[in-house]
Amino acid sequence: MPRGKSASGGSTAAGPGPGRQTVLSRFFRSAGSLRSSASSTEPAEKVTEGDSRKRSLGNGGPTKKKARKVPEKEEENISVASHHPEAKKCLRPRIVLKSLEKLKEFCCDSALPQNRVQTEALRERLEVLPRCTDFEDITLQRAKNAVLSEDSKSQANQKDSQFGPCPEVFQKTSDCKPFNKRSKSVYTPLELQYLDMKQQHKDAVLCVECGYKYRFFGEDAEIAARELNIYCHLDHNFMTASIPTHRLFVHVRRLVAKGYKVGVVKQTETAALKAIGDNKSSVFSRKLTALYTKSTLIGEDVNPLIRLDDSVNIDEVMTDTSTNYLLCIYEEKENIKDKKKGNLSVGVVGVQPATGEVVFDCFQDSASRLELETRISSLQPVELLLPSDLSEPTEMLIQRATNVSVRDDRIRVERMNNTYFEYSHAFQTVTEFYAREIVDSQGSQSLSGVINLEKPVICALAAVIRYLKEFNLEKMLSKPESFKQLSSGMEFMRINGTTLRNLEMVQNQTDMKTKGSLLWVLDHTKTSFGRRKLKNWVTQPLLKLREINARLDAVSDVLHSESSVFEQIENLLRKLPDVERGLCSIYHKKCSTQEFFLIVKSLCQLKSELQALMPAVNSHVQSDLLRALIVELLSPVEHYLKVLNGPAAKVGDKTELFKDLSDFPLIKKRKNEIQEVIHSIQMRLQEFRKILKLPSLQYVTVSGQEFMIEIKNSAVSCIPADWVKVGSTKAVSRFHPPFIVESYRRLNQLREQLVLDCNAEWLGFLENFGEHYHTLCKAVDHLATVDCIFSLAKVAKQGNYCRPTLQEEKKIIIKNGRHPMIDVLLGEQDQFVPNSTSLSDSERVMIITGPNMGGKSSYIKQVTLVTIMAQIGSYVPAEEATIGIVDGIFTRMGAADNIYKGRSTFMEQLTDTAEIIRRASPQSLVILDELGRGTSTHDGIAIAYATLEYFIRDVKSLTLFVTHYPPVCELEKCYPEQVGNYHMGFLVNEDESKQDSGDMEQMPDSVTFLYQITRGIAARSYGLNVAKLADVPREVLQKAAHKSKELEGLVSLRRKRLECFTDLWMTHSVKDLHTWADKLEMEEIQTSLPH
């Protein structure tokens, strides 16, 4: 239908009514007006998009007539050429040329290269405009202003901040002057609103809700286009990009995974309520509703409907997020002497907002920062909160930790001003926070417990409190009695980061994945929270005999029980969602109705089914640990499920969420008002039937537009003049009588107010549920323990696993033990060769030699892993095992330099060894693999010999020492009661080709590895055999074999000389001297004696 015609069929075409002027004003506004403002029923930005489309479609033909009906105020801002269409066609190319000339002025030789590149791109963008364009002159003026604004904005970006425009722009924003003098263009109200929010959150990428989509502006748009692979274009004064609202969670997660802090800005008012408000002529009000980083991904914006909507592909946006720790590090330098050495006191606080877990620690660390590295390796944080100034060794460690990760796994680093870490400021922050948060009867004790923490911990805690307040997540810190100390020497075995890495306890060293690690072998859990707890068990083996045996008793109970009760409980666990994360999301009041319903319904079903199993549990479960866990699980959550309307909760309809509104009087009142309006509209239907003389007339609803009266076009003449035409087709027309118009407007206002009221009541409902948070968390922790026990029981069922015997004595006795990971990886087709171990006070050191690739490193790792599994509370891969409690495990394995620390391979070895010497105790297990390599043979032997002797004589720990230096084995003669020499068994095979070729062609011996630990010394390492297996060229092998034979002959000769002259020195008679000479002649070495 031509635009010139009236919506009512032409009856009002004589003059533009108020409604018509409202429509026209959308298309023709002054340069300083709000282009994105809308009618009373549409979001502003939605109209903006429509305007641009309608303008481009309506500038030709029929709409030229319409353009002359613009009000005078609007016409004053339009170019004079608009009154002379013919002249305007001639002027438009000139305007384009002027814009290009203006653009060339900015591309001066003094401009930066990147400025020139950007301006050239803008010139190309402008040249695309046709020479005889159909755009209005006002549109061309805005295009020219946008080009100039983009150029000035790029210069301002390079001059100052990486976000948004230059400081001058922010100054103008604060002064409420929507005019950019540098670019001579006008900021729209939406842009001013964005600038104001951007000034408050300069370090965040902002997603701004605009109707049915979220928009990015400025550099945020360029970041989004680059990282999300979406389209970015120039609009007014900023580059802009957009995403649909229903895909927000996908794109927010992707940006967060890249390391960005992302803010979500939402509209805080609706069209109907805005129409009756005081600011109905201004832009929609918006505010920042959520901030997200890698550690704070909590909220319904980023959590899709897991297990309620099968169409959502979770793998599309997230990987394994089992641990999302935020780790805050603070270091307190000591006196000048310690400062020179690099020693200092370090405090760390780690929080996992997704689960509510809080850990802390305070420790003394050396210049190597090994203790801090251990905490980072154990927690594997995704985000670090650091002071702006740290010591050089710590900065190098942080750089190394963040650079090790790849792609989206990179650790995000957040810096905070040093002032917030100062003790006086931190103490005030902590006391104010807990004085406000703690109001229970035990509040004073909790507050005193926090204040009595070490100073570095308080400083780190204050920074965490301040940081989490940005995300409204500080509530998780309100229960300091639930804080856990990360490394307690009285509770957990000491395992540093080097040991975690060398033993591949959490991830393998090949591709840094879980497969091939100890955690992978033990993990048969059915729940996410159980998997997280098992990881803590693996990295923190127990020290208390009673707790270890309690776990072993529970595993044994599950393993040997013939009842089906355990299988039924395991099936219940398999059905559970991630209740721990869900409860934490509820506690922070960031969950959706779907998530709340899923969590509460799952807990209610679990409770009822466990209640039915309680008789069988009491009669068949012998373990006190399991019985206590299951009984304490029961928690009253049925009340909250009964209140909810399931179908409404699943679709997120908060207006119909509550069944009984007696506890929600505000919602009840609002619904009554809505019903009254609907009732009055229905009552008027009889009157409309009489007017139209249609007894069967009914309201119709089309495309969401309600209460329309539909009349055939042939009967339109009977419609009263004051009725408003809403829409039409070829057959019918639809109208709203004046009463319906007013009532429908009131109805929409009440409905939108109902939504706001329901949101407020929903938050209050979550607050009420949050009172049970800590009780329910305790129940979930018990469930996680049950899941871990079931997982360890599955490991024990694999075959040839035994229950270890734990003792307080210092001993490790293993009969036919196997390496847990290699045993599983080889499978049944390749049989792993078992080996036994016997370490105790009678023989606490094993010196292990043998050929390369003979299995020495695998053997010492096997002994260590079996010990760790025993103290976790797991069955172990052996026929028998008796393990004395080990307070710490220290390893020095491998050979690699450290470029970040500027250390060579040999320096790295000695640094780790020095740290072990300082930390190890008589109750520790020490593993040293080929210490001394990387330098000359004499220096290597000397260091290896002296270090091992120190451990034997002074440290007195259980030690496994692997070496290729035969002189080290002589320590067995010096300490026969403490040291034993062993080697990995092998067979030397004579090569037939070698025999055929004769002595002229030397080839290395062929060695068959037996992989069996055997008492005694291996005189040779048979390295040439490894070269042969590696397909080293034959001529190289021949030369190497010949040289090896020659060197062995020289060494043997020197040894014989030494023995010969030792015997001569011990000779006391002529007879003995003749005997020595005869022996010398017999051995035929006279000619080799020195002259």
From Swiss-Prot:
The keyword DNA-binding applies. InterPro entries: DNA_mismatch_repair_MutS-lik_N, DNA_mismatch_repair_MutS/MSH, DNA_mismatch_repair_MutS_C, DNA_mismatch_repair_MutS_core, DNA_mismatch_repair_MutS_N, DNA_mismatch_repair_MutS_sf, DNA_mmatch_repair_MutS_con_dom, MutS. One of its GO terms (molecular function) is centromeric DNA binding. ATP binds at G850, P851, N852, M853, G854, G855, K856, S857. Residues 1-84 are annotated as: Disordered. Pfam families: MutS_I, MutS_II, MutS_III, MutS_V. PROSITE patterns: DNA_MISMATCH_REPAIR_2 (PS00486). Residues 43-54 have a biased composition (Basic and acidic residues). GO terms for biological process: mismatch repair; somatic recombination of immunoglobulin gene segments. Residues 1-15, 24-40 have a biased composition (Low complexity). Component of the DNA mismatch repair (MMR) complex composed at least of MSH2, MSH3, MSH6, PMS1 and MLH1. Heterodimer consisting of MSH2-MSH3 (MutS beta). Forms a ternary complex with MutL alpha (MLH1-PMS1). Interacts with EXO1. Interacts with MCM9. This is DNA mismatch repair protein Msh3. It comes from Mus musculus. The lineage of its organism: Eukaryota, Metazoa, Chordata, Craniata, Vertebrata.
